[in-house]
Structure formats: C-alpha cells, structure tokens
Amino acid sequence: MPNEFVSVLAAVGTIAVIGLAVKFYNSWRSDKKKKSPILLVEPVVKYSLPLIKKDILSHDTRKFRFALPTSDHILGLPIGQHVHLTVKIGDEVVIRSYTPVSSDDDHGYVDLVIKVYFKNVHPKFPEGGKMSQYLENLKIGETVDFRGPSGRLVYKGHGKFSIKILRKDPPVEYNVKKIVMLAGGTGITPMLQLIRAIIKDSTDETQASLLFANQTEKDILLRDELDDIAKNHPNKLKLWYTIDTSSENWPYSTGFINADMIKDHLFPPSPDTIVLMCGPPPMINFACNPNLDKLGYDPKLRFAY
C-alpha cells in the first residue's frame, strides 16, 4: 500500500475521531446542563444564598461568591437578565439589581462583581451605598436573598433579541448582526455577560463594539478580561475606553462620551445594528442619547438596562 494512501487514511481517521469527540463533548455538556437543577424557577420567590468567598479586585471593587443549594445547581439566568438582592438594614428593606459575572456553565455558585460606595467619599452621597457597604461587611456563611430572573431583554443567540419596551408589554423580536455597547462603571456587567455568550458560541457571528466610560484608569472593572477578549476575538469585539482623568501615556479617550468617540470607535447606525446602554442615568440621558440622535441612530433600536 503506497505511503501516500496510508497517510490519507490516517488523516481521515484522525479527523473522524476528533469530530466524534467534539460531538460527544457537546452532547455531554448539553445533557449535563439539562439535568442540572435550576435555582431561579419562580421569579417572585426569594432564595437565601450564603456567602462563601470574597475577593478584593481593587480599592473599591469586590467579587462576591454565593453558594447555590448543591454543587450541581445552576442559577438559571437567561442572557440579558439580572437578579435582585434583598437585605434588611435596620428597619429598612433594601433591594438592588445586579448582573452576575458567572454563567450557567458554572455549577454550585454565583459570582457578583460589585463596586463598594464607601461613606464620606463622594460629597453628593455622604452615606455611600447601602447595599454595597452591607455586602462589604457581610461575613462568610451569612446569607442574602436572591430573586429573579428579571429584566426586559433576553439574548437568544445569533443576533436574536427578545425585548419588552415596557415591563408589562409583550416581547418584540429583533434580529441584528452588530451591537453597539455604551457602558459606564458597573454597567459593564450586563455587557460582559452578553459578550461572553457570543464568544462562547463559535457559530454566533454577531459582532460587538464597546465604549466603556470610567472616572479613572484604576476604576475600569474587569479590564483584564475585556482586553483579553478583544485581543483574542477581534472579529467579535471592538473595545475602546474613555476616562474623566487620564495620565500622559493613556492611549484611549479622555472625557465624557461624545459624538466623535461613538463615530470613531463604534459601529455606525444601520437597520441591523442595535444599541445597548448601561450606566448612570446622567450618562444615558446627557451623553449617550443626545449624541446617538446627532449621529442618526434609530431610537427604536436602542435599549437602556
């Protein structure tokens, strides 16, 4: 038997084995996910989850890990949705919404990255953030009530969005090829949730361009992961930063989001491009929407978390 023929047979055999292995893995992963018990079955039910780990990411940012009921459990949160955390501080019930940075590929726990707003730091908010300071002081083993899924947007993959204009409205389906993302501060978490879903699916050709605004360079949350995704998946993510105060060697933009930043670094308006925004209300109302209007982005193809 000629050597060339033997080589061809060997190559074909190797490809077949790899193909079967990939098929088996995908089937196993799908079956595992189907069999995994889901925590968030009823959106109105509260589930008490214990804190099992806290990582310090920066001077004011923490990653909190809460345990699910068993090591097999998944949270069961659709892409685009968030959870509500409820705590009682004195006589006051405090509720805040967060998007986890973990996903349903993670079993047994849920991770939240949260910026802590300390007392006596911002002159307009001398008391700081009630929920974030409560979580900062939470001890390992103590519990917080989770509720969800919640939210008006769900990403179904391959550029398909299901969005409710108002909370009680029926969802409207959108099919797009590109996503313009405008995020400020902790508003990056729902964007990262969506970006992760897109890059995880090799068949999802949806492209995202992200403009991420912060006060200073050290305030940029999850920067290492964002930079890594942009470097390794340039066909799926275009990334740009802007900060209020910059150093001499800062290679990105400085200042509030403006029309030039959007025009130079994000996808232009088109019928197959949707705009997603998440950040402080002044950013959305005074920096994002007026400049999107100026550049001709369709208001019907915009969504603010």
Residue ranges and their predicted role:
Residues P100, I188-S202:
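Histidine-anchored nucleotide/phosphate-binding helix
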Residues K35-R147, N214-T216, D244-T245:
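Ferredoxin-reductase
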Residues G19-L39:
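Transmembrane-helix exit/juxtamembrane "anchor" motif
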Residues G185-P190, P280-M283:
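Gly/Ser/Thr-rich loops at beta-strand to alpha-helix junctions
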Residues P2-A21, I163, Q207-Y305:
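Reductase modules of NAD(P)H-dependent flavoproteins
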Residues S97-G108, K156-L182, N291:
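Short, compositionally biased
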Residues G141, D145-G159, R167:
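Aromatic-rich membrane-interfacial microdomains
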Residues V176, K200-A208:
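Conserved S-adenosyl-L-methionine
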